[in-house]
Amino acid sequence: MAENSSNTASGSHRREVKRLIIMRHAEADWGLNDFDRPLTKRGHEQAAAAGAWLASRGYIPEQIMSSSALRTRQTTTWVSDGLGAKAPTAHLDEGLYEVSASRIIARINSVSENVHALMVVSHLPGVQDAAQRLMSPDSDLNASMDVYYGFPPSSIAVFEVLGEWALLDGADARLVDFKSF
């Protein structure tokens, strides 16, 4: 990971740039209870393409937190397949289902500071609201506009975070990329 150096009155220190990847699950089928909705054939293709895109851009998560709903579990499986051998084992989190931006951010705040690249796979409206809340003023303009105008299935927002996961709250993560599949 890249490092950013800054000098302070008390001397110099280094803060590592961390990467946060927020993803909405891929396209899901209808007709079942919400928690048990599977991905469509297109959803499987979207999630696999998302994993391959992440790998091609060097956006490799060290930890993946996923909602425990079927469609997010399946999305995570296909993304991991696209990431290949570098894919970590996903941690399923019931607290990422039907969740607000505040709850997603609270989950991020609990991540070990030893993790430098984190991926969260969840649902609307939480993923879009969290991405909007976290965007700093120096975020990429095109990516920011994409996040504001929609967060379709299998969309990914990629942030750079300078500082601790525990302190992440709002307007303090730089959105550097956004992609929908």
PLM region descriptions:
Residues 96-114:
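Short phosphate-binding loop-to-helix
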Residues 2-3, 11, 15-99, 127, ...:
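Active-site-proximal alpha-helix that buttresses catalytic centers in soluble enzyme cores
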Residues 20, 117-119, 156:
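Residue-level preference for the first positions of well-ordered beta-strands
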Residues 117-137:
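A glycine-rich beta-strand to alpha-helix segment
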Residues 32, 130, 168:
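Residues that scaffold the ATP/ADP-binding catalytic core of kinase and kinase-like folds
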Residues 135-176:
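Domain-level recognition of soluble alpha/beta enzyme cores
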Residues 57-59, 111-116:
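Glycine-rich phosphate-binding loop signature in dinucleotide/nucleotide-binding domains
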